[in-house]
Amino acid sequence: MTATVEIRRAADRAVTTTSWLKSRHSFSFGDHYDPDNTHHGLLLVNNDDQMEPASGFDPHPHRDMEIVTWVLRGALRHQDSAGNSGVIYPGLAQRMSAGTGILHSEMNDSATEPVHFVQMWVIPDATGITASYQQQEIDDELLRAGLVTIASGIPGQDAALTLHNSSASLHGARLRPGATVSLPCAPFLHLFVAYGRLTLEGGGELADGDAVRFTDADARGLTANEPSEVLIWEMHAKLGDSAT
């Protein structure tokens, strides 16, 4: 593969806007289809969603997908047809494996405050697995450490959540000004700036909503210029390479 580093600016994302939702899409999603922007590595969806108070997604189906949700502000209430329910808030990571099929709803838990969250989808190694749900508090780890592994299916990697994909993991970092982390080395990386401003070694400044897609790129550092939070997918395969 040819090594590439592609910066995608926040303003270039497609946007879905309704009376209660503003959803910014890093990849093709819903009515926004671009055949040249369907995925990177194994990552199919990276939606940056802001939901108005007392609103949300009514029950809807998913199948054969690993869905990770990360809340930036507010609280999101989850309920599904397998009997799982809970409120997700900043610092609490959630993974839902849709497997053979599941219905779930996602509602703003507040009647007065908006909720802001990022939802990310990757395919599992195999179709037809049993649907499952997992959530884990990792706020303390984010405050103590540089790069925290939020979810992973890569053998030997410790993570808060388990992914049913042996070639993918999601890392997060909450950085103070001046703090630096080293990005993982992998054939495919996807870096998303949840909030803040940072400098990417050899790549310039990044801000809220910006993303970087790495293909077979050299390791490099990422330094926060102000309080910042980033989400980084490490992927050792691309769509079509993973086990089925």
Swiss-Prot record:
EC number: 1.13.11.24
EC category name: oxidoreductase
Entry-linked SUPFAM superfamilies: RmlC-like cupins
GO cellular component terms, semicolon-separated: cytosol; plasma membrane
Residues bound to a divalent metal cation: 60, 62, 104, 106
Pathway stated in the Swiss-Prot or TrEMBL entry: Flavonoid metabolism; quercetin degradation
Keywords: Dioxygenase, Metal-binding, Oxidoreductase
Signal peptide range in chain numbering: none
Domain of life: Bacteria
Family to which this protein belongs: Belongs to the pirin family.
PANTHER family cross-referenced by the UniProt entry: QUERCETIN 2,3-DIOXYGENASE
Name this protein carries in UniProt: Putative quercetin 2,3-dioxygenase Rv0181c
